[in-house]
Regions:
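Terminal amphipathic helices with adjacent charged low-complexity linkers/tails
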Residues: 143, 222-224, 247, 254-321
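A glycine-rich phosphate-binding loop feature that marks nucleotide/adenosyl-phosphate handling sites
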Residues: 36-38, 96-103, 188-191, 195, ...
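Conserved phosphate/anionic-ligand binding catalytic regions in large, soluble enzymes, centered on
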Residues: 35-38, 42, 105-114, 202-227
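Flexible inter-domain linker/hinge segments
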Residues: 152-197
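Short glycine-/aliphatic-rich beta-strand segments at the starts of folded cytosolic domains
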Residues: 229-242, 257-260, 299-303
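N-terminal glycine-rich flavin-associated loop
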Residues: 1-25, 29, 47, 51-96, ...
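Flexible, glycine/charged-enriched surface loops at secondary-structure junctions
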Residues: 25-28, 90-94, 170-189, 247, ...
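Short beta-strand elements
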Residues: 51-53, 126-130, 194, 207-212, ...
């Protein structure tokens, strides 16, 4: 079965039913976005909660302060088309951007091309409105010590959430520091390391909710940070005879701080040569003559480097370095 909620109250009603009615306790509720995840996250034998049909409105945009408020069913391309005239965008850049919903992006803490400089979805979340398993609503924003203390005093399961999470991340701080790798892209799950280990050093439940795959709460509304569109972009194509050579060069290429690097192997290039797109990209993948002009080096692998920024001279230096 599929439920298409029209608002937060509908989500509350569904979750209240499954917790308060004994006959419904065994029913599993699975939130679904655009269904673009590759790990089968939205597959279930229970009830699918699909917010994409009705909860897909852009509620409020504040270009001066740089944020937007949306419902979880808004699609990434839909939002960025709305923002483009003001030369801003929501930075995480996913390949299925014409289908991926913002609610799904938060729940998987999605990132894509450009994540080296823009980070993950969670790095752009300012606030989340959520519905907990018993139907109670929870508002998540970064909290300083005084505000966190006030949130802990809230009645019901909401106050308990803030108490328990704060207790866990403080008591297990050494273990969290030891276990969680110092990498920008490493996991989807309960990101305990960022609850306090964020740039503002405040208690931030957004990082825990992001990437939790809907297992902690159902997101009903999002407030997201906007980013200025880069004025200039450059694409650099580096050709290789062997795939291993491209892998060895990766660390060197990263030092020039590209927004994205993508390496394409011989199998994909051979498929591209059989496709109608070949005429558009053939200059990127043809074999290269060596400087002597006598020998030809086979192009079996290419690395695509994208550079972007607002300073044209700086960008040209990056590309030519």
């Amino acid at each position: 079965a599929v439920v298409f909620p029209k608002n937060s109250s509908d989500i509350q009603a569904v979750l209240e039913l499954t917790t308060q009615q004994k006959s419904c306790h065994s029913i599993k509720i699975t939130a679904r976005g655009g269904g673009t995840g590759t790990n089968g996250q939205s597959l279930t034998e229970g009830i699918v909660l699909d917010c994409s049909r009705y909860m897909n409105r852009i509620l409020e945009t504040n270009f001066k302060q740089g944020w937007v408020r949306v419902e979880p069913g808004v699609v990434l391309d839909q939002l960025n088309e709305h923002l483009a005239p003001q030369e801003v965008f929501f930075a995480p850049d996913l390949s299925p951007s014409n289908r991926a919903t913002l609610g799904g992006m938060v729940n998987t803490d999605a990132c894509g091309k450009g994540s080296r400089i823009y980070g993950r979805t969670s790095d752009h979340v300012l606030a989340l409105s959520c519905v907990l398993s018993n139907g109670e609503t929870l508002e998540s924003v970064p909290l300083d010590e005084d505000k966190l203390s006030a949130y802990k005093q809230k009645s019901g399961i909401v106050g308990e959430v803030f108490k328990v999470v704060d207790q866990i991340v403080l008591e297990k701080a050494d273990l969290i520091e030891e276990v969680f790798p110092k990498m920008s892209r490493f996991m989807t799950g309960y990101n305990l390391a960022k609850v306090y280990g964020n740039s503002e050093k405040n208690f931030n439940l957004n990082y825990l909710l992001s990437g939790s795959e809907g297992t902690l709460a159902v997101v009903s509304e999002l407030k997201l940070r906007l980013t200025a569109l880069p004025k200039y972009k450059r694409l650099l194509v580096v050709k290789y005879e062997h795939f291993d050579d491209a892998l060895r060069d990766a660390q060197i290429l990263v030092e020039n701080d590209p927004a994205a690097i993508e390496t394409i192997d011989e199998k994909i290039l051979s498929l591209a040569k059989e496709d109608e797109i070949y005429l558009k990209i053939k200059d990127f993948i043809v074999d290269e003559k060596q400087k002597s002009g006598k020998k030809t080096r086979k192009t079996r692998t290419i690395s695509l480097l994208e550079f972007c920024g607002n300073n044209k001279n700086k960008l040209e230096k990056q590309v030519s370095a």
